[in-house]
Amino acid sequence: MKYIIVTGGVMSGLGKGITTASVGRNLKNKGYKVTAIKIDPYINIDAGTMSPYQHGEVYVLKDGGEVDLDLGNYERFLDTELTRDHNLTTGKIYQTVIDKERKGEYLGKTVQIIPHITNEIKDRIRRIAAKSGADVCLIEVGGTVGDIESMPFLEAVRQMYREESPENIALLHVTLVPIDSQGDQKTKPTQHSVKELRELGLTPHVIVSRCKKALMESTRSKIALFCDVPVEAVISAHDSADIYEVPLQLENEGLSNYLLKKLILKSTLEDTNWEEMVIRMNNCTGNVNVAIVGKYTHLEDSYISIVESLKHGAIEIGCKFEITWFDAESFDDDPSEVEKLNGFDGILVPGGFGERGTEGKMLAIKYARENNIPYLGLCLGMQLAVIEFARNVVGLDGANSSEFDENTPYPVIDLLPEQEDVVDMGATMRLGDYEATLKAGSLAESIYGASLITERHRHRYEVNPNYVDRIEEHGMIFSGKNKNRMEIAEVPSKDFYFASQFHPEFKSRPGRPSPPFKAFMGAMLKKSKEKKDQ
């Protein structure tokens, strides 16, 4: 097994995740099977109970793992499926070690950071890498070198570096090269970051320098001199117009070839599919405008998979798109604000939890339905679509979800039966892959081109089956079902009205877009052309 460790210095948010994913993509293009592990040094067991404002979107894996959004980038760039084990957290490691201590597995020894915690980290990494069957395992260490939370993980990496053969491990350090008021690129932050890394016993083989513009040769040479790496190992990772251009940029910098040389590997393939996809993306014509009405719109990373899925659909049909974000609470406060949705080619309501903003979202859904604007609802976006339809079309005044109103006279959305006795919040929802059978002749079947699909879920509430017949009598049909569970709602009388209990955005890939997002993008493009022809 070959290991590539990715660390970061100077500050957080430099793009270690995209760098890791891009390195992996380029190695895959060279013919190697790649897997990736994300280390998050927080004490939470997983990301499932975190607010999106803390770390952005909670990404859901096929096995139901609720993980850091970086694993979404790994899956999209590598076109692979990971598991919950691929996200290591301090909480998971400590919980395992404490459980072992309680079982007496340490034979009465004093349990310490070294060797017990570090051994558990190393064992996890090696076990995950071996189980994946990959040729190369990328390991991104979250946080910044110097953070106290990261110390046990960096020590484990140091030990791995000592234990593995030199040709089996490479250390890649991502740093920042800022520009001063005179426009000069400054190397001091990088020098100090590498110095701090060395104090921990780690010497980087490659330095990836994040900067606004391409590194000047003088800057590159200075970093090489003071950080003791070859000039060709100083990589310019300057700002790109789109994250999908980063693998091409790093390839042009010679990074993958340098890593192959370090790891004594040979290129067995030159896959150009990624490059061709980027060319198609940059040659898209036409434009559609989509309104996203959500609860966490102040941080776009809260909906990163949705944005990327829209991009995948747009690339596939060859159009550009622009997103306008709307805070659903603004519609709560002033319902007339919903008129701002006039003129959009499509409206999307994403998932979420809690009552805040739900009435505003339903105003947006109603506006889409009444004005025949293409609508895509995801998870809560489906539940609210059902509530809105029940209130305003079926005539069930006061219909609601029991999540928001326990005393509603018409609980058209209710708690999943298996959730009734659940007390803990973490990892207790209906999570991960579940199948859905699609109704023949429905929009859903035409979108997927199949009668049976598998998608990822994350919810505690569902459409109450006691109201299904009554709702369907008035024109909304449930075209996707998992036994007696409603998975997809659509209104056939509208040009495009599709809402799913699942999250199709988690399975969308560049070059292989999620069917609902591709169809939604197509419906918006059609709407845009119709407006121009009027």
From Swiss-Prot:
Positions contributing to UTP binding: 12, 186-191, 222
Pfam families, A to Z: CTP_synth_N (PF06418), GATase (PF00117)
Residues bound to L-glutamine: 53, 352, 380-383, 403, 460
Keywords (A to Z) from UniProt: ATP-binding, Glutamine amidotransferase, Ligase, Magnesium, Metal-binding, Nucleotide-binding, Pyrimidine biosynthesis
GO biological process terms held by the UniProt record: 'de novo' CTP biosynthetic process; pyrimidine nucleobase biosynthetic process
Ligand binding (Mg(2+)): 70, 140
Miscellaneous notes: CTPSs have evolved a hybrid strategy for distinguishing between UTP and CTP. The overlapping regions of the product feedback inhibitory and substrate sites recognize a common feature in both compounds, the triphosphate moiety. To differentiate isosteric substrate and product pyrimidine rings, an additional pocket far from the expected kinase/ligase catalytic site, specifically recognizes the cytosine and ribose portions of the product inhibitor.
Name of protein: CTP synthase
